[in-house]
């Protein structure tokens, strides 16, 4: 779960130092292509082009962009995700600031669902987990693909996208 927390934090990072900290949590001391030493200011610049703006985002981190058909944020998917959070008794701490279908908020919901699933064997929680993972599997591969194809991407961000894809694939196998 530490990796999921670190991926959540990576996609919510506000600056180069937060990106570096989350990245090192994801990668551990040294891991394949992750063992290089990136210029974190360059990573921050690429991160902003991909996920923040102010220009058009190269890889929007919102499920509604990929699932609602018009590349719009705050669509039907956002409200569906908000409903799933509500079923868990959760509310986004960024409500009215950051759309509920942001990748980091969805990863945070996975952490909450997994925590609840470990504490109870309620069928409803297991079904909600399955529904939420199906939702993530419907859009995260598209999101990761956008990252990997984006002209502004950076090897560090590409590595995180690959880790996210690998984690999601492993979840589907459980």
Per-region residue spans from a language model:
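Surface/interface-facing alpha-helical segments and adjacent flexible terminal/loop regions used
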Residues: 1-174
């Amino acid at each position: 779960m530490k990796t999921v927390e670190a991926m959540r934090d990576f996609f919510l990072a506000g600056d180069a130092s937060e990106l570096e900290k989350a990245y090192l949590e994801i990668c551990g001391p040294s891991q394949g292509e992750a063992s290089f030493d990136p210029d974190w200011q360059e990573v921050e610049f690429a991160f902003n082009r991909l996920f923040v703006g102010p220009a058009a985002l190269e890889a929007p981190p919102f499920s509604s962009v990929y699932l609602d058909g018009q590349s719009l944020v705050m669509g039907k998917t956002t409200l569906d995700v908000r409903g799933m959070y509500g079923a868990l008794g959760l509310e986004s701490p960024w409500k009215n600031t950051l759309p509920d279908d942001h990748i980091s908020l969805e990863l945070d919901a996975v952490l909450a669902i997994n925590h609840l699933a470990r504490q109870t064997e309620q069928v409803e929680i297991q079904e909600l987990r399955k529904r939420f993972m199906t939702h993530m599997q419907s859009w995260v591969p598209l999101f990761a693909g956008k990252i990997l194809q984006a002209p502004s991407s950076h090897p560090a961000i590409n590595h995180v996208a690959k880790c996210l894809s690998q984690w999601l694939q492993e979840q589907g196998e459980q």
